[in-house]
Amino acid sequence: MKYKPVHRFDMSPKDMIKVQKQLAKEVKLIHFSDEPNLVSGVDLSFPKDEGLAVIVTMDFKKLSVIDVTYAVDKITLPYIPGLLAFRELPIFLKAWEKLEIEPDIVFFDGQGYAHPRRMGIATHASFFIEKPTIGIAKSKLIGEYEEPGKKKGEFTFLYHKDEKIGIVLRTRDNVKPVFVSPGNLVDFNNALDFTYHFATKYKIPEITRKAHLYTQSLKQR
């Protein structure tokens, strides 16, 4: 799959923040009205000085894996809190270029709109791949929320500075919730409904859980 080269990645942290703020003005949290057909889940890992990006594409209705694409490359940027996308996107885009199946929506193991500058990896990536995106995170980055009920499917909203930025979703009874946020070109209802569709028997929804399992398997090779 091709992507739009929105900006370069070798810049100072100060310039990275400027880019985030500029792109944040262009985020569109709009309703995705169709039922997806094919969707992809993305997981990234950084063993030693390398980056590994895995894209798992699944049939939305059947919940079946139809493709696994990955890329490995050297990592040049250190981890900087709040600027993770600048470290992760280059390796993700290498995997994206190898992808031969076009997904309707792309899920990321990470944040979307629930970011200090509303520019988590899922949101940032959408400008390059020009696809609707959703972030599914295991933990909260920022914001305040009321704990959702203990039953599967119960949820509350995550807020930051009085703005709704995400969803705190219980994917299993009596298990810690996941933090879901729209990336771009979807709304909060889409992010909730499409994520919950993949909440089968595990805490982590299948769309990013499968990607993580393949990441762990590839790391052991």
UniProtKB/Swiss-Prot annotation:
It catalyses: Endonucleolytic cleavage at apurinic or apyrimidinic sites to products with a 5'-phosphate. One of its GO terms (molecular function) is RNA endonuclease activity, producing 5'-phosphomonoesters. Pfam families: Endonuclease_5. It comes from the Bacteria. Its EC number is 3.1.21.7. InterPro entries: Endonuclease-V (IPR007581), Endonuclease_V-like (IPR053396). Belongs to the endonuclease V family. It comes from Petrotoga mobilis (strain DSM 10674 / SJ95). Mg(2+) binds at D43, D109. Its cofactor is Mg(2+). One of its GO terms (cellular component) is cytoplasm. DNA repair enzyme involved in the repair of deaminated bases. Selectively cleaves double-stranded DNA at the second phosphodiester bond 3' to a deoxyinosine leaving behind the intact lesion on the nicked DNA. It is found in: Cytoplasm. GO terms for biological process: DNA repair. This is Endonuclease V. The record marks Y79 as: Interaction with target DNA. Disulfide bonds: none annotated. The keyword ATP-binding does not apply. Keywords: Cytoplasm, DNA damage, DNA repair, Endonuclease, Hydrolase, Magnesium, Metal-binding, Nuclease. CDD domains: Endonuclease_V.
